[in-house]
């Protein structure tokens, strides 16, 4: 008589439940001493997406048109990096404007004297995909709050082949009290479209990262647009009060928690947010 198959009493894997809560690669399983084929293919696909995000061309003209439809002026500038190859090989060139762009910005500042509270800069960085996807919805949320508090803003400065520090030169040339740059972050294997915000008080050429505050991972699966705008406005208020930014200015904005009963305070957690937040 044939013996019945042995029923193995396998232990529960608590990681499987956690997989649905994060895009991180956990509980992949294994096949022999390797990971399953599907997990390997998924990894290779994510790596290809990250590489594509770095080389995706920025479309400043298209973004400028979308801003114009919403009633926002913009200026199209270029860093000193002539192309993507130069940008990747020479980070220093991405931190400064080209001579032509710097002069164009001086001309704009001369025609519009008086400066502004906040210069708004958008640069492709290492992920134009992030900029294309998240700039407009974030600016909408940010400008709702800056308008309510009476802050004056510059036109949106669109910089091709730009790095974080290019915002300091732009803020200085515009005579801005503060500057924020929206820039595509280095793509990760689970986040090829992550937008970063870098904020500086009293911007000028030559400042280091120690003088900047960073708000990172702005995207639907990360920090919501509303919460990112909330944190930025907090930094703006505190920077003006204390006249500084960077390592000496801590982000102590109200942090949203899972235990909060206020639905408006739940928008910073991607587990509880709707796609429209």
Swiss-Prot record:
<keyword id="KW-1283">Bacterial microcompartment</keyword>
<dbReference type="GO" id="GO:0008851">
    <property type="term" value="F:ethanolamine ammonia-lyase activity"/>
</dbReference>
<feature type="binding site">
    <location>
        <position position="164"/>
    </location>
    <ligand>
        <name>adenosylcob(III)alamin</name>
    </ligand>
</feature>
<dbReference type="GO" id="GO:0006520">
    <property type="term" value="P:amino acid metabolic process"/>
</dbReference>
<feature type="binding site">
    <location>
        <position position="185"/>
    </location>
    <ligand>
        <name>adenosylcob(III)alamin</name>
    </ligand>
</feature>
<protein>
    <recommendedName>
        <fullName>Ethanolamine ammonia-lyase small subunit</fullName>
        <ecNumber>4.3.1.7</ecNumber>
    </recommendedName>
</protein>
<dbReference type="GO" id="GO:0031419">
    <property type="term" value="F:cobalamin binding"/>
</dbReference>
<keyword id="KW-0170">Cobalt</keyword>
<comment type="subunit">
    <text>The basic unit is a heterodimer which dimerizes to form tetramers. The heterotetramers trimerize; 6 large subunits form a core ring with 6 small subunits projecting outwards.</text>
</comment>
<dbReference type="InterPro" id="IPR042251">
    <property type="entry name" value="EutC_C"/>
</dbReference>
<dbReference type="InterPro" id="IPR042255">
    <property type="entry name" value="EutC_N"/>
</dbReference>
<comment type="similarity">
    <text>Belongs to the EutC family.</text>
</comment>
<dbReference type="GO" id="GO:0046336">
    <property type="term" value="P:ethanolamine catabolic process"/>
</dbReference>
<dbReference type="GO" id="GO:0031471">
    <property type="term" value="C:ethanolamine degradation polyhedral organelle"/>
</dbReference>
<comment type="function">
    <text>Catalyzes the deamination of various vicinal amino-alcohols to oxo compounds. Allows this organism to utilize ethanolamine as the sole source of nitrogen and carbon in the presence of external vitamin B12.</text>
</comment>
<feature type="binding site">
    <location>
        <position position="214"/>
    </location>
    <ligand>
        <name>adenosylcob(III)alamin</name>
    </ligand>
</feature>
<comment type="pathway">
    <text>Amine and polyamine degradation; ethanolamine degradation.</text>
</comment>
<dbReference type="InterPro" id="IPR009246">
    <property type="entry name" value="EutC"/>
</dbReference>
<keyword id="KW-0846">Cobalamin</keyword>
<dbReference type="Pfam" id="PF05985">
    <property type="entry name" value="EutC"/>
</dbReference>
<dbReference type="GO" id="GO:0009350">
    <property type="term" value="C:ethanolamine ammonia-lyase complex"/>
</dbReference>
<keyword id="KW-0456">Lyase</keyword>
């Amino acid at each position: 008589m044939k013996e019945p198959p042995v029923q193995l009493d396998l232990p529960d894997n608590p990681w499987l439940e956690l997989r649905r809560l994060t895009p991180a690669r956990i509980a992949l399983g294994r096949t022999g001493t390797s990971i399953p084929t599907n997990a390997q293919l998924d990894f290779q696909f994510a790596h290809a997406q990250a590489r594509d995000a770095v080389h995706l061309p920025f479309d400043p003209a298209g973004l400028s048109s979308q801003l114009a439809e919403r009633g926002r002026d913009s200026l199209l500038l270029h860093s000193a990096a002539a192309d993507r190859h130069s940008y990747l090989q020479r980070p220093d060139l991405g931190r400064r404007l080209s001579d032509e762009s710097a002069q164009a910005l001086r001309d704009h500042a001369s025609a519009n004297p008086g400066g502004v509270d906040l210069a708004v800069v958008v640069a492709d960085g290492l992920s134009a995909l992030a900029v294309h996807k998240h700039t407009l919805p974030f600016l909408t949320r940010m400008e709702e709050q800056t308008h309510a508090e009476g802050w004056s803003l510059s036109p949106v400065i669109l910089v091709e082949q730009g790095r974080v520090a290019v915002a300091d030169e732009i803020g200085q040339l515009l005579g801005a009290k503060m500057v924020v740059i929206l820039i595509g972050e280095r793509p990760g294997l689970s986040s090829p479209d992550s937008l970063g915000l870098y904020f500086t008080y009293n911007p000028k050429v030559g400042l280091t990262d120690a003088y900047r505050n960073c708000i990172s991972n702005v995207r639907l699966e990360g920090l919501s647009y509303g919460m990112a705008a909330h944190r930025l406005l907090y930094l703006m208020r505190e920077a003006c009060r204390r006249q500084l930014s960077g390592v000496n200015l801590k982000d102590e904005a109200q942090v949203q928690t899972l235990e909060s009963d206020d639905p408006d305070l739940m928008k910073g957690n991607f587990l509880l947010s709707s796609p429209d937040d």
